UniProtKB/Swiss-Prot annotation:
InterPro entries: Se-bd_putative_YdfZ (IPR017704). Transmembrane segments: none annotated. Pfam families: YdfZ (PF14001). The keyword Repeat does not apply. The gene is ydfZ. The modification S-selanylcysteine is found at residue 52. This is Putative selenoprotein YdfZ. One of its GO terms (cellular component) is cytosol. It comes from Escherichia coli (strain K12). The keyword 4Fe-4S does not apply.
């Protein structure tokens, strides 16, 4: 599933991202999309990033690189 970060860059599983509030970087391990609309996915805490204990909203992420 593709969703979009805070700058409207496409992010998917495997994308390298930075958490805007903390500066933590990592790869997206999964995006929970089951039964959700695109808007709910983008605004809800649906993304698991390696090294982060809690799920994050795509709007809290910034894509790093072009992957």
């Amino acid at each position: 599933m593709t969703t979009y970060d805070r700058n409207r860059n496409a992010i998917t599983t495997g994308s390298r991202v930075m958490v805007s509030g903390t500066g933590h970087t990592g790869k997206i391990l999964s995006i929970d999309t089951e039964g959700l609309t695109a808007e709910q996915i983008r605004r809800g805490k649906t993304v698991v990033v390696e090294g982060c204990e809690e799920k994050l909203a795509p709007l809290d992420l910034i894509r790093l690189g072009m992957n």
